[in-house]
A protein has these predicted regions:
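Short, acidic, metal-binding catalytic loop of nucleotide-sugar glycosyltransferases
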Residues: 50-60
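Short aromatic/hydrophobic "clamp" motif used to bind/position activated sugar donors
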Residues: 115
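C-terminal, non-catalytic tails of nucleotide-sugar-dependent glycosyltransferases
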Residues: 1-32, 153, 165-192, 238, ...
């Protein structure tokens, strides 16, 4: 099957004797540009960067730090100190708080063929995390790749995103135990998915530019989902892999509902997203079983 599809790969045992995994083989080791943007739930950028530098086996990467005008002076000083490293550079964002626009500007400064958008509250777990994501994103039919993120208490933060849950979008398998295999093995098997969060999102620069990058109208939320759906529109696949593992030091209580109470922008961007992607949302998430509940992220049967 892999040979017919033109995907050189080695097949290995997976999580169990009945599940297998394909290790896709590529002759190139492209430069990966890791773009880190500041957020409100960070430990600090220094810990994230140290984690990358100490625990990443893949040698060919650069780090781009987005420095916005609202950062505290001590944070700005920290960024400048970090930027003295050979791998690390900064890009200043002087505009208003806009995640999409800031990251689009950062992309302009990157030298890599592959982009990795990363929150500054991330801690690397396995040394080959970049290789695990890269093997998928280098496939010509793949647009973006997401990783397996854990909360600090070792419960699952997400296995990708599901559209339609709670009339919006929610994390797949949120709060599941660390060692859970998930719904039909989804937490231990690489699989296609509709959308991926930008907390750890890898995409080829060519694909990112082809779809127009992040939509600046999504300054606070939905920019990553919009990007994912634009990638699907171009007939690329979005892939989630359980073999790239990271901790995300993000509060369990912080989600779209809590943001709504604090930010009027969220309601406007939500309405814009629902209008822009009305046809897709009406049809339902193609990677989610229509017999399952849309009330929770636990893959339980829908009670009609």
């Amino acid at each position: 099957h892999l040979k017919r599809g033109g995907h050189p790969a080695q097949v290995e045992d997976g999580y169990s004797s009945t599940w297998y995994r394909a290790q896709y083989q590529h002759a190139i080791m492209p430069l990966i540009s890791i773009i880190i943007s500041p957020s409100n739930h960070t430990l600090n950028a220094e810990k994230t960067i140290n984690s990358i530098l100490k625990k990443t086996a893949y040698p060919n990467y650069e780090i781009i730090l987005i420095e916005n005008k609202n950062m505290e002076k001590k944070e700005t000083k920290l960024y400048k100190q970090i930027a003295q490293g050979n791998r690390i550079d900064t890009v200043k964002w002087e505009g208003s708080s806009n995640y999409s626009s800031a990251n689009n500007k950062a992309v302009e400064q990157t030298k890599g063929e592959v982009l990795l958008f990363l929150d500054d509250a991330i801690q690397v777990i396995n040394q080959d995390w970049l290789e695990e994501m890269l093997q998928f994103v280098l496939r010509s039919d793949v647009g973006a790749v997401g990783a397996k993120l854990y909360y600090p208490d070792d419960t699952i933060q997400h296995g990708g995103l599901i559209l339609g849950i709670d009339n919006l979008v929610r994390y797949s398998h949120k709060h599941f135990p660390k060692n859970s295999t998930g719904y039909f093995g989804q937490l231990v098997l690489a699989h296609n998915i509709s959308a991926l969060p930008a907390s750890c999102l890898m995409v080829r620069k060519q694909v990112f530019q082809e779809v127009g990058g992040f939509n600046k109208n999504y300054s606070l939320a939905f920019g990553d989902i919009d990007l994912s759906l634009k990638i699907l529109e171009k007939k690329y696949l979005n892939v989630w892999t359980p073999y790239a593992k990271l901790y995300h030091h993000k509060s369990k209580k912080r989600d779209h509902k809590t943001i709504t109470k604090k930010e009027n922008r969220f309601a406007k961007e939500k309405a814009y997203f629902e209008q822009q992607w009305a046809d897709f949302l009406e049809k339902g998430d193609p990677y989610y079983n229509p017999n399952l509940t849309l009330d929770r992220e636990d893959f339980s049967i829908a009670l009609k």
